[in-house]
Amino acid sequence: NWDVAYAERLLKEFGLDRERKTRVDKLSKGMMSMVTITLALASRAPFTFLDEPVAGLDVVARERFYQLLLEDYGETGRTFVVSTHILDETNGVFERVVILDEGKVLENTPTDSLLEQFRLVDGPAEAVEAACTGLKVLSRETLGRRLSCVVRGTPEQLAALPADLDAGALNLQKVFVALCGHGEVLNHE
């Protein structure tokens, strides 16, 4: 399945065409990541596994990687399994998320389904406490008379939160921290 033309295009786009005579062990970490990305994408393998593919890349190159990934998926429909710790950059990229913590699978679900289960509820402490009844409270922070809680519930429970409280959606990174932050999980059931 190796796609020579695609590999050449990626090498040129990443500026690696000028480095052809450089030994691989002499490349920077970012350049090594670009070589790995080129090999993975140009392989055209039906299942492609990438472990921390953006390590060492600057923000522009990381953004371009995710664009390339989406373009490739759109053209071929092949499956990509990507492990990363830079979750903010993956918003809107992955259909499914698997969250691991110390080797244990905490979540294995469609990304949208996971995100719709979490909210950051903020407002007067008493009102937030009352609103969180029946929800799983994963973290809480008090500032004066205000209380902020990260909560998990069904979409119906979250839709029923009082309109006078701020109840913002969380991005994937915030959900990950809530699930893996190892703080005390407080149940208000």
What residues fall within each predicted segment?
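ABC transporter nucleotide-binding domains
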Residues: N1-D101, L106-E107
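Non-catalytic surface loops within mature trypsin-like serine protease
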Residues: R18, A125, G153-P155
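Alpha-helix N-cap/helix-start and coil->helix boundary motif
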Residues: L87, V128, L172-Q173
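Conserved beta-strand-loop-alpha-helix hinge in the C-terminal portion
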Residues: K104-A127
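Short, conserved charged micro-motifs
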Residues: A127-C132, E156-A160
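C-terminal coupling/interaction segments
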Residues: S139, L143-E189
